[in-house]
Amino acid sequence: MGEIRLVNIGFGNIVSANRIVAIVSPESAPIKRIISEARERGTLIDATYGRRTRAVVITDSDHVVLSAVQPETVAHRLTARDASLAAAEEEEGEE
């Protein structure tokens, strides 16, 4: 199946990076609608610890995760992890 990769979405909360479809801002009406529908379906995960929602993580399992960190920060953590994995794989290949 492949290696499980994880990304920190703030306050020690971690999401499977392999399952992330989108990381978006919660400001637009369509995203607010997605949040509301997920709440009704029981697939909303609030990981904000009572703080303001700054990022909405949408997964391939239709779960919607609310995060208190900026979407850019989550994306940076995700891409930084990918870059470090690629560098480690290159080093292994050189040995």
Swiss-Prot record:
Pfam families: RemA-like. It comes from Symbiobacterium thermophilum (strain DSM 24528 / JCM 14929 / IAM 14863 / T). This is Putative regulatory protein STH1338. Disulfide bonds: none annotated. InterPro entries: RemA-like (IPR007169). Belongs to the RemA family. The lineage of its organism: Bacteria, Bacillati, Bacillota, Clostridia, Eubacteriales. It comes from the Bacteria.
